[in-house]
């Protein structure tokens, strides 16, 4: 889910703010989701 993804990114990139940057990323990172994922990151949010 998005919270887990956020925590992984924060661990890998300290000081980052992933929820601000990835909330509406691609087709699945954010609220809802449909269609074909645009890349591996979007696929992870699925």
Swiss-Prot record:
Coiled-coil annotated spans: none
Record-annotated disulphide pairs: 29-45
Catalytic activity: a 1,2-diacyl-sn-glycero-3-phosphocholine + H2O = a 1-acyl-sn-glycero-3-phosphocholine + a fatty acid + H(+)
Cofactor(s) in the UniProt record: Ca(2+)
Biological process per Gene Ontology, one example term: lipid catabolic process
Cofactor mode of binding and number, as noted: Binds 1 Ca(2+) ion.
Enzyme class: hydrolase
Tissue expression remark: Expressed by the venom gland.
Keyword Transcription regulation among record annotations: no
Keywords of the record: Calcium, Disulfide bond, Hemostasis impairing toxin, Hydrolase, Lipid degradation, Lipid metabolism, Metal-binding, Platelet aggregation inhibiting toxin, Secreted, Toxin
InterPro entries according to UniProt: PLipase_A2 (IPR001211), PLipase_A2_dom (IPR016090), PLipase_A2_dom_sf (IPR036444)
Gene3D superfamilies: Phospholipase A2 domain
GO terms for MF: calcium ion binding; calcium-dependent phospholipase A2 activity; phospholipid binding; toxin activity
CC per GO annotation: extracellular region
SMART domains reported for this sequence: PA2c
Sequence positions that bind Ca(2+): 28, 30, 32
Annotated compartments: Secreted
Enzyme Commission (EC) number: 3.1.1.4
Family according to the record: Belongs to the phospholipase A2 family. Group I subfamily.
General function of this protein: Snake venom phospholipase A2 (PLA2) that inhibits collagen-induced platelet aggregation. In terms of inhibition of platelet aggregation, superbin c is more potent as superbin d. PLA2 catalyzes the calcium-dependent hydrolysis of the 2-acyl groups in 3-sn-phosphoglycerides.
The protein's name: Phospholipase A2 superbin c
Organism whose genome encodes this protein: Austrelaps superbus
Classification of source organism: Eukaryota, Metazoa, Chordata, Craniata, Vertebrata
